[in-house]
């Protein structure tokens, strides 16, 4: 974008602006948003000061940030994102927004140069003083001494939570001399202490818990945007007492008890344990001298104000909202007089003393004495939308007027295409920058702005893809912390006490923890399991691979099995029969498909390439991979049968559209079958829009078409005039004949009835089939289906999808009103989820009284199909502002303009339901909001409370996500394999079911499990060899280490585990050293064919297999074991060698030496 800033800074008009920009009370008028951003960016580039850009709300701040990223390095651009909503302080915070705020405050506190975008709400928000913030930014260096208690206290003050194992942002842990911290900014950090000295600092991976690189020093930023010290708590308690005493007599007697409870709950907090999320509500009472963000800026900072009058309007409504919000919480006994979240001074008072430049599109009256006024003439650019003639005449006008023409396109390929297009129009253009660019020609560069603009006085026009092709601007990637799926779904296999488990031989039990037992004078760790009645089972940790976590549908509570009964055997046999049947069915289908002859497509045509380049967004890697897999299938002679699986809004439709276009380009017809009329309409519109520039005839068959139109479409399919038909089950009627059907695309097949599914099966015959589903297919199942069903998975969301901001709140009409007003004020729409059909119309009336000007519709499952579809269609077409609905919206409907979801009684929903419902919003490039409301003061059932707790962790991270994924995976498995399988999955648990299915499929395909070259080794030694609780306190970590030891087969793996133990838990005690010795002995035994090593008191028995006996070189063995002398004796039993070792001092070392010698005495068989 250098060319643009070069052209601007050389112009006299900009130079006039530059002279007064940064002087007090300057007004700049006439600039469109993108033109304004270009000027502000150039001013910033030329100055050495901090620049503060104030907007009226966060939405505007986001838009300006996207454009500014084109000109300013992401490292120097900061945003202070505060929602335009009071309830934010009353709900679970989004870690993403919090980390952006912390990054901004830290940069300001360090006096860094930068361009800082702050919405009005952020400007007024109460904050910790800058001095306190600076005192709580820590830099740690190797070799420094720290006071550990003081350091840990400071972390708590900064908003960190102490956990036994660090797995989420904002946590820390202490194990021995190791401190782990996961800051909001940067990598997780591991600090190893030698007494009080920092011995080393390493970053580590939360997924593996292993250290990565050593670092010399690290900055630890806060985990909250408030600092809360003991002093702050003391001051807070005093202020709170006064506020309570002041409020109590002034409120209604009926709520005084509620106020007392609110006060008591806050009074309990001590600095050693408090929740920043809750205390932030009391920010007005925390600090003797609270600050705002303006106090963090340098005294010579420059301020730019975007649309002063709009800011004043927002300020007015913000004050009214804040007053009404605080009044409501006081009146309901949930708040105190004097409580507030923002500074009430006028925004002009806040920025007094700084030089302010005001930007306004129109010349306007302002209550400010202006020193300078700079007027620009700026015009919007004609919208061409691919219309060649209009484009050519407009470009010709620019050339004739000697304009500098800057064309911005988003990829290198598009630069070449654009140049070719301009060349056809005889418009001179260049793509490489020269020292100076002559006017009267176009320069085409990679870049993007939200809109184009024309500055006639400067002789400059900037044209973007939005005007050229109606493309939306791609949002720039910004340095937000990437949250990997692995981190989100850390592992639903984590075993917690009380979890249900499945033992391969004994069935479903309950996990009670790891216990160290003394058996025969030695200590060992066992997994303790509870079965039916008082039955208990202790499983040695070295047999833990027989125990899996029981994973089934969310609402499924399994029945415990009885130990020693036949019930479990019967259950397993039933499931075994079922998986064998399904495996056979899958194999038969697969063989049938392999034998079938389909149409073999050629390589992509030139039209295909052009069509794909017209897609206005970057494909995600998963989309690109799925498209390649589908094209590979189409280019084979056997018919395709592929399942494309991806979350709602992850871009499955574009993948399907490309496959459809490929089929049409080779003269084939495409049928696109969808479960509902509305989806048919939406897919039809997408196809029309995507293929408008190509000779493709697309028709729709649904209730929205007249009988005459349907008759014409049927005729067109028969004659071949229609290339693509989109439709509901109407497409399945027997009187429809295709001239040459080549591709059938089925969306959400599981939503069709049995009769329709049968008809789909007949349609599939010898035709390529692509099935789309939004329900995730679990990876384990994916693996067991390899070679039987072709699956493509899209797991990554498109780049410009913002994470949905999720709030968990008590039900309160003022919260609801605020959320509704905020969405409608940005011309958006709202889903209001109310799942009681009998009183849904009363709920609509209640909301209508709250929002008299809003158009409110109702949708529920008891309406006729026609009424429901018409209501939904009106909502999609923006005829209603709010849709009060039941869970009927859970699947399928795409309403890009609806970006707020409010769910009443969220505690009654399953997590997977909430996850899917939340996917309804945040579908466009706007931020989506989801409010999960639960009744105030309601006594929740234990399950609802657990669920609510999980929902509270349902922001970007947290276990709520894991549980939702787990339940959806099981639903996905049911959809893939048939509903009756769902029941079988629930009886034996998901993992065991997947394992049984995989074995059955492999057996039917004749693939034998590779038998281990070396048999299983049993090592039984009378030694205290285990992981003591004093060394590893966290049971999950303990189980994880035992699992790794159980799977160890090489010495490299042993070294790796030793490193991990020292890395994560510090130096290990003698019990752990012995455990590692036993694993080392086992590895030698594995490699040398030893089957048993048993401690018999005074001697140790060692048994070799017959095969190992044949392979051993006796001479080499006897020579190598001479140092053992007479303590070792050799014999033969049933053609297999046995060795006894008499125990003496250091017998464990002797045993290690002996098994190593046995391994080294093995003859290597000639395979070459």
Curated annotation (Swiss-Prot):
Residues 808-969 form the Helicase C-terminal domain. It comes from Staphylococcus aureus (strain bovine RF122 / ET3-1). Disulfide bonds: none annotated. SMART domains: CarD_TRCF (SM01058), DEXDc (SM00487), HELICc (SM00490), TRCF (SM00982). One of its GO terms (cellular component) is cytoplasm. Couples transcription and DNA repair by recognizing RNA polymerase (RNAP) stalled at DNA lesions. Mediates ATP-dependent release of RNAP and its truncated transcript from the DNA, and recruitment of nucleotide excision repair machinery to the damaged site. One of its GO terms (molecular function) is hydrolase activity. Its main location: cytoplasm. Keywords: ATP-binding, Cytoplasm, DNA damage, DNA repair, DNA-binding, Helicase, Hydrolase, Nucleotide-binding. GO terms for biological process: regulation of DNA-templated transcription; transcription-coupled nucleotide-excision repair, DNA damage recognition. The gene is mfd. Residues 633-794 form the Helicase ATP-binding domain. ATP binds at residues 646-653. This is Transcription-repair-coupling factor.
């Amino acid at each position: 974008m250098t060319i643009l800033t070069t052209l601007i800074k050389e112009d006299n008009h900009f130079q006039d602006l530059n002279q007064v920009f940064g002087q007090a009370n300057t007004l700049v008028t006439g600039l469109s948003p993108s033109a304004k951003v270009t000027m502000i960016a150039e001013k910033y580039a030329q100055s050495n000061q901090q620049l503060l850009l104030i907007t009226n709300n966060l939405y505007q701040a986001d838009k300006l940030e996207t454009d500014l990223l084109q000109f300013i390095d992401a490292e120097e651009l900061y945003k202070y994102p505060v929602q335009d909503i009071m309830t934010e302080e009353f709900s679970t915070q989004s870690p993403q927004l919090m980390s952006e705020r912390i990054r901004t405050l830290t940069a300001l506190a360090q006096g860094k140069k930068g361009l800082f975008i702050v919405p009005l709400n952020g400007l007024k928000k109460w904050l910790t003083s800058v001095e306190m913030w600076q005192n709580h930014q820590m830099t740690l260096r190797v070799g420094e001494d720290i006071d550990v208690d003081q350091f840990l206290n400071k972390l708590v003050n900064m908003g960190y939570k102490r956990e036994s194992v660090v797995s989420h942002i904002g946590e820390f842990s202490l194990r021995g001399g190791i401190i782990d911290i996961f800051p909001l900014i940067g990598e997780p950090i591991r600090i190893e202490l030698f007494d009080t000295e920092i011995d080393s600092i390493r970053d580590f991976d939360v997924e593996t818990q292993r250290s990565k690189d050593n670092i010399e020093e690290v900055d630890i930023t806060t985990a909250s945007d408030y600092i809360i010290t003991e002093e702050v708590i003391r001051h807070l308690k005093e202020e709170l007492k006064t506020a309570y005493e002041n409020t109590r007599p002034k409120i209604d007697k009926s709520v005084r008890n509620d106020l007392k409870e609110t006060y008591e709950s806050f009074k309990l907090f001590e600095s050693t344990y408090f929740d920043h999320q809750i205390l932030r509500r009391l920010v007005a009472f925390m600090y003797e001298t609270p600050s705002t963000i303006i106090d963090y800026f340098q005294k010579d900072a420059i301020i730019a104000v975007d649309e002063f009058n709009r800011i004043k309007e927002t300020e007015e409504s913000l004050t009214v909202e804040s007053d009404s919000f605080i009044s409501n919480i006081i009146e309901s006994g949930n708040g105190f007089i004097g409580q507030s979240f923002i500074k009430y001074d006028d925004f002009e008072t806040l920025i007094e003393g700084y030089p302010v430049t005001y930007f306004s599109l129109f010349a306007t009256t302002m209550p400010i004495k202006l020193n300078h006024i700079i007027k620009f003439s700026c015009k919007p650019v004609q919208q061409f939308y691919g219309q060649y003639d209009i484009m050519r005449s407009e470009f010709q006008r620019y050339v004739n007027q000697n304009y500098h023409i800057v064309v911005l396109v988003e990829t290198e390929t598009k630069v070449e295409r654009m140049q070719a297009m301009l060349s056809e129009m005889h418009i001179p253009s260049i793509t490489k920058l020269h020292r100076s660019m002559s006017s009267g020609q176009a320069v085409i560069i990679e870049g993007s702005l939200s809109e184009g603009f024309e500055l006639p006085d400067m002789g400059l026009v900037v044209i973007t893809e939005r005007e050229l092709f109606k493309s939306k601007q791609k949002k720039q990637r910004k340095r937000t912390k990437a949250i990997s799926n692995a981190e989100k779904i850390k592992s639903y296999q984590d075993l917690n006490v009380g979890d249900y488990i499945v033992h391969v031989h004994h069935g479903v039990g309950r996990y009670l923890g790891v216990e160290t037992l003394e058996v025969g004078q030695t200590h060992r760790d066992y997994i303790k399991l509870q079965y039916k009645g008082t039955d208990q089972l202790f499983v040695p940790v070295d047999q833990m691979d027989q125990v899996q976590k029981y994973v089934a549908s969310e609402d499924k509570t399994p029945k415990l099995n009885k130990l020693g009964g036949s019930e479990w055997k019967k259950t397993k046999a039933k499931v075994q029969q079922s998986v064998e049947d399904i495996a056979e069915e899958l194999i038969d289908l697969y063989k049938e498909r392999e034998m079938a002859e389909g149409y073999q497509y050629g390589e992509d045509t030139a039209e295909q390439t052009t069509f794909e380049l017209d897609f206005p967004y970057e494909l995600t890697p998963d989309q690109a991979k799925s498209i390649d897999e589908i094209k590979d299938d189409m280019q084979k002679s056997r018919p395709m049968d592929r399942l494309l699986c991806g979350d709602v809004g992850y871009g499955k439709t574009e993948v399907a559209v490309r496959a459809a276009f490929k089929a049409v380009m080779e003269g084939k017809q495409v049928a696109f079958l969808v479960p509902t009329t509305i989806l048919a309409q939406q897919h039809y519109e997408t196809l029309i829009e995507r293929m408008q520039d190509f000779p493709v005839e697309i028709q729709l068959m649904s209730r929205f078409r007249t009988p005459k139109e349907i008759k014409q479409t049927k005729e067109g399919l028969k004659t071949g005039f229609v290339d693509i038909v989109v439709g509901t089950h109407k497409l399945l009627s027997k009187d429809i004949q295709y001239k040459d059907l080549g591709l059938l695309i089925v969306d959400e097949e599981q939503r069709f009835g049995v009769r329709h599914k049968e008809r789909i099966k007949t349609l599939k015959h010898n035709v390529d089939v692509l099935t789309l589903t939004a329900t995730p297919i679990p990876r384990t199942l994916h693996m067991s289906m390899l070679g039987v069903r072709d699956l493509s998975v899209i797991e990554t969301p498109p780049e410009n999808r913002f994470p949905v901001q999720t709030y968990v709140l008590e039900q309160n009409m003022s919260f609801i009103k605020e959320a509704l007003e905020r969405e409608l004020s940005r011309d958006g729409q709202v889903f209001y989820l109310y799942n009681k059909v009998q009183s849904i119309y009363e709920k609509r009336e209640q909301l209508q009284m709250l929002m008299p000007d809003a158009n409110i519709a109702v949708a529920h499952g008891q309406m006729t199909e026609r009424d429901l579809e018409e209501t939904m269609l009106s909502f999609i077409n923006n005829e209603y502002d709010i849709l009060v609905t039941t869970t009927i919206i859970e699947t399928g409907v795409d309403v890009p303009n609806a970006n707020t979801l409010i769910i009443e009684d969220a505690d009654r929903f399953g997590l997977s339901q909430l996850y899917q419902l939340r996917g309804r919003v945040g579908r466009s490039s706007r931020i989506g909001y989801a409010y999960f409301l639960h009744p105030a003061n309601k006594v929740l059932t234990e399950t609802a409370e657990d669920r609510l707790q999980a929902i509270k962790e349902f922001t970007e991270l947290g276990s709520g996500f894991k549980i939702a994924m787990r339940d959806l995976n099981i639903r996905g498995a049911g959809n893939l394999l048939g509903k009756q399988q769902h029941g079988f999955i629930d009886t034996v648990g998901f993992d065991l079911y997947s394992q049984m299915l995989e074995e059955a499929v492999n057996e039917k395909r004749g693939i034998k499990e590779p038998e281990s070259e070396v048999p299983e080794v049993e090592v039984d030694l009378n030694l205290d060899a285990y992981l003591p609780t004093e060394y590893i306190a966290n049971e999950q970590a303990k189980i994880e280490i035992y699992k790794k030891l159980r799977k160890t087969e090489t010495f490299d793996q042993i070294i790796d585990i030793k490193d991990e133990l020292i890395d994560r838990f510090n130096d290990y005690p003698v019990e752990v050293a012995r455990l590692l010795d036993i694993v080392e002995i086992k590895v030698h035994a594995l490699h040398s064919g030893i089957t048993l090593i048993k401690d018999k008191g005074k001697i140790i028995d060692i048994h070799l297999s017959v095969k190992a006996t044949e392979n051993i070189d006796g001479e080499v063995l006897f020579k190598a074991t001479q140092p053992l002398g007479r303590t070792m004796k050799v014999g033969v039993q049933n053609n297999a060698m046995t060795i006894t070792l008499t125990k003496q001092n250091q017998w464990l070392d002797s045993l290690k030496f002996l098994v190593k010698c046995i391994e080294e005495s093995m003859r290597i068989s000639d395979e070459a």
